[in-house]
Amino acid sequence: MKVNLIFEKVGDVNSDYPYLCVYKEGEREPFMEISVSKERKIEFVFYSRADNFSLSSEEFYGIYGRAEVFLPQALENEDSL
């Protein structure tokens, strides 16, 4: 099964680390973000939605896998400053 997720890296001057906004393909608004906590660990922030929302197991594992790749990259960027 194809996972139809879009990951957008966002840099924010108010955040110590960049974060990833996660979209379902074809949607304009993200449903969650993957960020790095002050403790330098992955955080998953889910946004409120008016409709019921679900993820397949493939999508869920795809998000987690992307987060595991993103964490060391985000930390490396911060450590190099």
Task: For the regions a language model picked out, list residue spans one by one.
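Alpha-helical transmembrane segments and their juxtamembrane interfaces
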Residues: I6, S37-E39, E76
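Negatively charged, low-complexity tracts enriched in Asp/Glu with abundant Ser/Thr
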Residues: M1-Y23
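A short, structured beta-strand/loop element
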Residues: Y17-L55
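Mixed-charge, Lys/Arg-enriched low-complexity segments
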Residues: K41-L81
